[in-house]
Amino acid sequence: SRGLGDVYKRQVLKEALETLSEQPGCDFGMHVIPYCHQRGDKIMAYNYQGYWKDVGTLSAYWEANMELIDIIPEFNLYEEFWRIYTKTDVIPPQYFSADSKVNACIVGDGTEVYGEISNSVIGAGVVIEEGAVVTNSIIMNNTVIKKGAKIEKSIIAESVEVGENAELGVFEEAENKYKPKVYSGGLVT
């Protein structure tokens, strides 16, 4: 539930996740915690008052990322107290060609934009070629979006190459026949 942080011993959590991995739609709060409780594992929680967002579905993950683009997002990465301590690769800053178009995006270091990006979160080391259009999407690190590709409301994994003139997410919304509860919502992954 919102505002509660759960702490687990690694081995206990690993065993629970392995046991429940085959269960369709396995959810932490609905399945893992009750499973550990039934097994007699010690369960502890603490009242957490900071930012928290359930990103247990692709739609929720997409929404949380899109919220980062808001003028003043609830989870404001630019607040002085939100220091990010991490080891990062030494790569050049972003590059935007004279012909590129950028509107309301977060763009990682080393990214080169020759096309058009709007309302998107773009990871580090991404290349968006001339004529490519990315809208309302999450593009993870080291991905190449080739010339003329159109990507809309999609989550693209890292180190992927989207081919020339490919179209992802540019369609009428349709129910996913394989896992409708997991993948419905107009997202392409």
Model-predicted segments: where are they?
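General structural signal for secondary-structure boundaries
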Residues: S1-R2, T189
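Nucleotide phosphate-binding site architecture
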Residues: K14
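Short, small-residue-biased leader/transition segments that mark boundaries at the very start
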Residues: G3-Y8
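Left-handed beta-helix
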Residues: Q11, T19-T189
